[in-house]
């Protein structure tokens, strides 16, 4: 399971700058310049600890995979980058085993899983979709 410490430890170990930036177009944005990465966090758009965890986990997926795109990129390229970041997030922090443990503990609804993992429902949905549709794994109650 993801902890904010995972994000900050990774960023420190890989020399990724984490910069608060008000007025960004999204709660979190990752950029690369000459091989160096920075994650910008707009705390005016991050209204809860759960959302902060989700944003940091997702942006970590962008940094770890290098899945970035230009602002002017076509929609298909943007979606490909987002998919890669979401896939990395599922493979590292919302694993098949994590879901099996959650289901075994009685957490089966999307909102319950979001509470269990302390992540936004959309992140849980993305990971469940990845495991069920891409890896053909089913989670039963």
Describe each region flagged by the PLM:
Residues 1-141:
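Active-site hotspot residues in diverse enzymes, especially metal/ion-binding acidic/histidine motifs
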């Amino acid at each position: 399971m993801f902890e904010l410490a995972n994000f900050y430890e990774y960023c420190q170990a890989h020399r990724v700058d984490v910069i608060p930036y008000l007025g960004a177009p999204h709660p979190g944005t990752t950029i690369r310049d000459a091989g160096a990465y920075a994650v910008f966090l707009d705390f005016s758009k991050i209204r809860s600890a759960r959302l902060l965890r989700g944003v940091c986990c997702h942006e970590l997926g962008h940094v770890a995979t290098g899945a970035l795109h230009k602002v002017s990129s076509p929609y298909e390229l943007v979606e490909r980058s987002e998919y890669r970041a979401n896939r990395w997030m599922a493979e590292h922090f919302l694993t098949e085993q994590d879901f099996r443990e959650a289901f075994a503990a009685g957490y089966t609804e999307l909102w319950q899983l979001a509470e269990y993992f302390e992540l936004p429902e959309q992140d849980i949905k993305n990971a469940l979709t990845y495991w069920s549709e891409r890896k053909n794994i089913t989670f039963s109650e």
